[in-house]
Amino acid sequence: MPRSQDPVMRTRRFLEHLTRKYYERARVKLPGDFSLREFALQTWTGKSYLRHLSFASTEAVHRLLVEKAPRHFYYSSARYDQPGADDMDAKGWRSADLTFDIDADHLPECSGSIVEVDGGIEGKTSFIEEALCMRAAALRAQILYDILVYELGFDKSRIAIEFSGHRGFHVTVYLDDFDDYAKAGSDVRREIVNYVKALGLRADVLEPWTMLQVRRGKPIPIPPNVQLAGARGRVARIIRRLALRDGAIDIVKAVEGPSTTYSEELREYEDKARQLIGVEIDEQVSVDVKRLIRVPYSINGKTGLLVKPVTVDELDEFVVDETLSPFAREPPVRIRVVTSLPSSVTILGNRLKLREGDSPRLPAPVAVYLMAKGVAVLAQ
């Protein structure tokens, strides 16, 4: 690597070098209709985005990634007649997938654990408590998946979930041009957002249904069941997700099969599920019919981690650690911290206390994470 007097540029060149090494050996995951999509990227050494890119082959995509070694790489949720046209109106919009973005730092479980940092190379940045926050975000992704499948009727094979490479998850429903939802504008997509968030849902709708006990002639409450429609069915499916995480098989059986047993434990799970009835998603991402989204298996330049596909069941045990970095096999890297962190933080499973001027040698994934965040540079 060439040495530069500018530590920031030298750091970015180093990150670009590592990124190129990754793209030389790896392949990103593209949708089958990628030739109808617009692509965009930002390099490690530039501030502006290179947009209006289109490709006719996967090899052309690979060549560009090796050449540019981009910090960020995106493709459009929309399909176009002319995706490479510079003018958006000239592209000829055809349709768009449904896209959802879940950010851990927007969730109530995470709000009290965010560490804000000023004075970094990239400006203000922040760190989250990874285990707590990402577990909460993973649960929201599972709840969203269940809504899409069991309430909105989308085929499981069309739904993809990815770790964003930073602090959340992307959920995409891949659609064809002829699908009504694919042609839907922002207004219809906003209605879907409101439905997912359970906006306007009356509290009484969540109350237990009752049945008349013939022998005693009095109503008894019926536990929520995953086969039910509407809000009660959603509550039951959330209970199932929570119980599966905890290994509470009796609770899973109670909401999956016909049951009139309303145990105290089930009531506790139901109380938790009611609080999760609305999924906190980024509305702007979902209503935008021309959204740029990160390409699976590309590098997220905010952290140096991969945009990693995960299955809905893998979310139960999802953790952010060094295995999510494409640089796990690189040798340790010495960095110089350029701004102090006000408290210790956990980065990829490593608990760190960093002060300005510190020069630790760290595992490559952790060092890259800190340099990408702008709180450290490559040491001389």
UniProtKB/Swiss-Prot annotation:
Leader sequence residues: none
Chain's gene name: priS
Class of the enzyme per the UniProt entry, highest EC level: transferase
Gene Ontology MF terms in the entry: DNA-directed RNA polymerase activity; metal ion binding
Assembly mode: Heterodimer of a small subunit (PriS) and a large subunit (PriL).
Similarity comment: family membership: Belongs to the eukaryotic-type primase small subunit family.
Keywords: DNA replication, DNA-directed RNA polymerase, Magnesium, Manganese, Metal-binding, Nucleotidyltransferase, Primosome, Transcription, Transferase
Stored Gene3D superfamilies: DNA primase, PRIM domain
Record-given protein name: DNA primase small subunit PriS
Pfam families: DNA_primase_S
Active site: D101, D103, D282
EC number: 2.7.7.-
Organism for this UniProt entry: Hyperthermus butylicus (strain DSM 5456 / JCM 9403 / PLM1-5)
GO term, biological process aspect, one: DNA replication, synthesis of primer
Cofactor names: Mg(2+); Mn(2+)
A GO cellular component annotation in the UniProt record: DNA-directed RNA polymerase complex
Function: Catalytic subunit of DNA primase, an RNA polymerase that catalyzes the synthesis of short RNA molecules used as primers for DNA polymerase during DNA replication. The small subunit contains the primase catalytic core and has DNA synthesis activity on its own. Binding to the large subunit stabilizes and modulates the activity, increasing the rate of DNA synthesis while decreasing the length of the DNA fragments, and conferring RNA synthesis capability. The DNA polymerase activity may enable DNA primase to also catalyze primer extension after primer synthesis. May also play a role in DNA repair.
InterPro entries named in the record: DNA_primase_S, DNA_primase_ssu_euk/arc, DNA_primase_ssu_PriS
